[in-house]
Regions:
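Single conserved position on a long alpha-helix in the C-terminal lobe of the eukaryotic protein kinase
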Residues: 19-134, 266-364, 412-414
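Short intrinsically disordered coil segments
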Residues: 62-65, 203-210, 242-243, 354-356, ...
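Leucine-rich, highly hydrophobic segment in Treponema pallidum outer-membrane-associated proteins
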Residues: 100-102, 108-237, 366-414
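N-terminal mature-domain "stem" immediately C-terminal to a signal peptide or N-terminal signal-anchor/transmembrane
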Residues: 1-7
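Generic detector of solvent-exposed, compositionally biased contiguous segments
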Residues: 9-20, 72-78, 144-168, 242-272, ...
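Short acidic/polar alpha-helix capping motifs at helix-coil junctions
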Residues: 7-9, 139
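Generic recognition of flexible, low-complexity loop/linker segments
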Residues: 33-34, 173-177, 211-214, 256-260, ...
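Long, K/E/R/D-enriched contiguous segments that form extended
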Residues: 221-304
């Protein structure tokens, strides 16, 4: 990631940061780009330009208590400082490298990683790669280039949703231009591939715009995910979240939920009202089907459920009521369409306050206030922890993909 210091909001943030954490730090050129990266061993690194090495050394002593250097030494590579908060600093004539965080046992590993970076030949460095040139051609206030698989959840999930069936995440990388406004971030994303065949597919793939379930979208829900998909892809996305993974495991005790979801092909609309106190979120899934042959298996699944405790399948006038322990699901399929819900009101009414998603082939929104309403005991995982950790600062998020290559993310702050 590369930052541009010309944006007035970024300048103000850095002034605030300098007053609080970097007070009196001198010797760093804050006007030049700052590069941020993540190492293969998952440490965060930051590189900035140094204008005066001696001035920098003396001013490091003016850091706040929780940032003050605890150890300092000089060798042939650089001047080294260990900070109290788990970060390591190395600087030499023209550059400063900050890396971490890590505990005391990790300090040696972090320093070794830093030493390898400091001693890299140009031909081995990031600067010699096409990615470096591509990064410097981006024109956002913040610019980022990354392989999809190393992005954090849910950001990597957004990108994977765009991919055609015959292009893998391993083949693609993301370029993002981030514009910063007073209460909003606008992120313009482009998916690229160094694989010529994959890049050709990304450029030429024509995905129809979402229309089939658009009128069913209800903006009172915490999460709305609307996309073109096929069963195996949707299964993979759901299994990344432990709450849905536990739900699928429970359903598979009674019916073959994997078989049902693998029958999906076409548009799919997943709406999560909120994360409830049980393991099962309050949700509704509507999807087009390649076939509904699984409905023929319900009589056999019913007989099997009758022989087991804590589970049942009951026909209703709208489909089937499926129960496993304290988990309840309601399913119906007809006209090659699936409706699966955690709510007994299985018929999904059309709503009038649907968001404007025209010209989108993938759409997702998160309303952070509505998502965590009445949720005090949800199953913790990286995804929910990430969202909860930022929900105090964020109001909502909206993701739109225009095609397989281009997408936007708008993040609104409180």
């Amino acid at each position: 990631m590369k930052t541009c210091m010309n944006n007035p909001i970024i300048q103000q943030k850095f002034q605030d940061l300098q007053q609080k954490a970097l007070k009196n730090i001198q010797g760093i050129d804050w006007e030049k780009p700052i590069y941020i990266f993540v190492t293969p061993n998952e440490y965060i690194g930051t590189v900035a330009s140094v204008t005066d090495e001696k001035l920098l050394a003396s001013s490091l002593q003016n850091l706040p208590t929780n940032w003050k250097p605890t150890k300092s030494n000089i060798d042939e590579d650089a001047t080294w400082n260990s900070l109290k908060n788990g970060w390591q600093i190395a600087y030499k004539k023209h550059a400063i490298l900050l890396m971490g965080p890590g505990n005391q046992q990790e300090a040696g590993t972090i320093r070794q990683t830093m030493r390898e970076i400091l001693n890299e030949d140009y031909d081995e460095s990031f600067m010699s790669t096409p990615f470096y040139d591509e990064l410097n051609q981006l024109k956002g206030d913040l610019n980022m280039i990354s392989h999809i698989n190393v992005l954090p959840i849910p950001y990597n999930t957004f990108m994977k949703l765009q991919l055609p069936e015959n292009v893998s995440a391993q083949q693609t990388y993301l370029c993002s231009e981030i514009k910063i406004y007073q209460n909003k971030l606008c992120i313009q994303n482009t998916l690229n591939s160094n694989d010529k065949e994959a890049e050709k597919i990304l450029e030429q793939q024509v995905t129809p715009q979402l229309t089939h379930f658009e009128s069913f979208i209800n903006t009172n829900n915490g999460i709305i995910l609307y996309m073109h998909t096929y069963g195996e892809k949707l299964l993979h996305i759901l299994r990344e979240d432990p709450n849905f993974r536990a739900m699928l495991a429970g359903m598979n005790q009674v019916i073959d939920a994997d078989l049902i979801l693998r029958s999906i092909k076409g548009e799919a609309l997943l709406q999560i009202q909120n994360f409830s106190e049980s393991e099962v979120p309050t949700f509704t899934l509507q999807a087009q089907l390649a076939n509904q042959n699984f409905m023929e298996k319900f009589p056999d699944w019913q007989k099997s459920a009758q022989k087991k405790k804590d589970m049942f399948i009951r026909p209703t006038h709208e489909g089937y009521h499926i129960s496993y322990k304290n988990q309840h699901f309601f399913l119906n399929a007809g006209n090659n369409q699936l409706l699966l819900s955690s709510n007994a009101q299985i018929q999904c009414p059309k709503v009038k306050n649907s968001p404007h998603i025209m010209q989108s082939v993938t759409y997702m929104s998160i309303n952070f206030d509505k998502l965590w309403r009445s949720s005090t005991n949800i199953q913790k995982n990286n995804s929910t922890n990430f969202i909860q950790s930022i929900s105090e600062q964020l109001k909502s998020l909206e993701f739109k993909a225009k095609n397989c290559k281009k997408s936007t993310i708008d993040i609104y702050f409180r």
